[in-house]
């Protein structure tokens, strides 16, 4: 999938799940299941409930996403 096809939205982490997955509530009210991107995992960036994050969604499945950025 080309990189420019993904939809980037902001949201808030609600709860951590096993295997580096998180339940994220987007700013528009939708709930998605998101995992951490490889670069964030490589650099040991911690994500806690309540953190504001940027999530990339695929246009094919809008219920799953990838966390690409954690706001400071």
From Swiss-Prot:
Residues 1-72 form the S1-like domain. Gene3D superfamilies: Nucleic acid-binding proteins. It is found in: Cytoplasm. NCBIfam families: infA (TIGR00008). CDD domains: S1_IF1. Pfam families: eIF-1a (PF01176). The keyword rRNA-binding applies. One of the essential components for the initiation of protein synthesis. Stabilizes the binding of IF-2 and IF-3 on the 30S subunit to which N-formylmethionyl-tRNA(fMet) subsequently binds. Helps modulate mRNA selection, yielding the 30S pre-initiation complex (PIC). Upon addition of the 50S ribosomal subunit IF-1, IF-2 and IF-3 are released leaving the mature 70S translation initiation complex. One of its GO terms (cellular component) is cytosol. This is Translation initiation factor IF-1. Component of the 30S ribosomal translation pre-initiation complex which assembles on the 30S ribosome in the order IF-2 and IF-3, IF-1 and N-formylmethionyl-tRNA(fMet); mRNA recruitment can occur at any time during PIC assembly. It comes from the Bacteria. Its main location: cytoplasm. Belongs to the IF-1 family. InterPro entries: NA-bd_OB-fold, RNA-binding_domain_S1_IF1, S1_domain, TIF_IF1. SMART domains: S1. The keyword Protein biosynthesis applies. Keywords: Cytoplasm, Initiation factor, Protein biosynthesis, RNA-binding, rRNA-binding. One of its GO terms (molecular function) is translation initiation factor activity.
